[in-house]
Amino acid sequence: MTDRWTLSQLSGTIRWVLSLEYAGGTWYLGQESITIDDGTGGTIVISDGLLDLADMTETLDLWSTDSPRRSVPVEFDLGVDVAALVEEGHDLAGCVAELAQLADGDDWSARRPFVVGRLQEPQYGADGEGVRASIEQDVLSSDETIDVSTIYASDLSSALIATGVYAAATFPTADVVAPLVIGAPGDGTVAGSKAAYTCTLFVVATGLPARFYVLAGHAVAATTVTLANPSDATTVTTPVLIVTVNGIALSVAVEDTTTTTMTPAPVPVVTWLGGGLIDETGGVLETAGDFIAYLLRLTEQQVDHGRTNAAREALRAFRVGTYLDESTVIADYIREAVLDIVPVSLAVGPRGVYPYVWRWDATATDAVAHFDVTEDPDIERDGLVTYEDGDRIVNTLQLLYQWNPQTEAYGAEIWAVGDPASRPRGLRFGGSTATLTRSYWTDPVLATSVGRYGIRRETLETAIVADVLTAEHVLAWRSRRWALPSRVVDYTCPQRWAWIEPGDLVTVTDPDLAWSERLCLVQSRAWASDGSVRYTLRVLEG
């Protein structure tokens, strides 16, 4: 299967094929009877049983924090008495189905899955009446969780003593939580996470006591950290020790009690002088793209790794610094903590789910195709240009970031402004106060928005961003998205144009709209029964 339809494939018929796991077998249904290669040396017989399809649309749900869902109504006839099979115990509800596209001459392994899921609310009648249902594919709709480890002080103490470096002393009987640490919370300048005092042991070589604090429930890249007592702000810089406890690699801070400059604290806060989690694919996990890829790997979703890796590269400028100290539902965390902060939407493609990265700074040179209605009369506008999101305009945005567990508050803020008067009173560009580091960022599109619509304010909080450069990137893409209303319009094209996919950039020349190479984003692609495709285009404003 190619990543895109080729012109050779699009010059022939694109067939729809429904495969259904039911009653102990696999059924293959199309809109005509054909026999194809299965890709392994055998053949597959596709029966003429796919009666009707509707809403064959691939949509990129841009800037949505909801999980993507694709639902396709289908009507089919298996050629058998379904009512009798149901009474024999073969339940239609919930059986797995795949609707795929197949080009002339391709074998089954080259098909392009359009939707894979279970039949929802199927309807059936007598023999010959067929079955009606919807195939629904949900992404990140499960309750899979990111789990943090709970460590008993006695287990950690035993593991340390087993190394021969330490001897028994005292330790609490309570358990402690070993958090997940991503990147450098606090950006290496302020406290970014919490540690937990676990035990005190003697160093065998010196006979002197050392205190041990659990930093993370995994190996980290940092070799030293700074601990601080949140009550009196005394600090100490300690080495980081990796020790395995019950099969879990823990990162532990080792405090020399004879030289420490910190007064004892059961839960000190941590300033990270290096990175956190080491990604299993290599390197320190510290960018938004790497973080999203990591979270997707924790799910049971089929992931398009090729497109996910491309997204990782596109998001290198967005650094992540955060920690989790309680189990969290992955889907909820992605929706609530990540998707509002980075220019990403989750999308579903033939190879699985992937993060689509919106190119907010794209230009006409990034377009993959040019629609010119004056040169190609087969390209036709379908309907009127529509304004959207006029009620969601924001041109003055306050971003609170760099969560500090010591103060239990955000340590920094940055403003995106189009009008200097919309800045907080009494503060200058780049100024600061005793409680928050404040700075400002602007874009001409914000000034345009203020001039047209007046000041529209919003405050956004994020616990996953710790550095100012990433904060500026967040303001940049959100300003380009929400400062102005967005316009959408549909164009219908012959099938030969169907290689263009949702997420692509195109330019449009249409004298009726006074457009000359207007840059647009392809939001959706709909396949019509006559072989044409309809594209919904979103104008990139600004």
Regions found by a protein language model. Give the residues of each.
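Solvent-exposed beta-hairpin/edge-strand motifs
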Residues: 217-231
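Surface-exposed interaction regions enriched in Ser/Thr/Asp/Glu
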Residues: 228-302
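C-terminal extracytoplasmic interaction modules
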Residues: 1-111, 123-133, 138-221, 272, ...
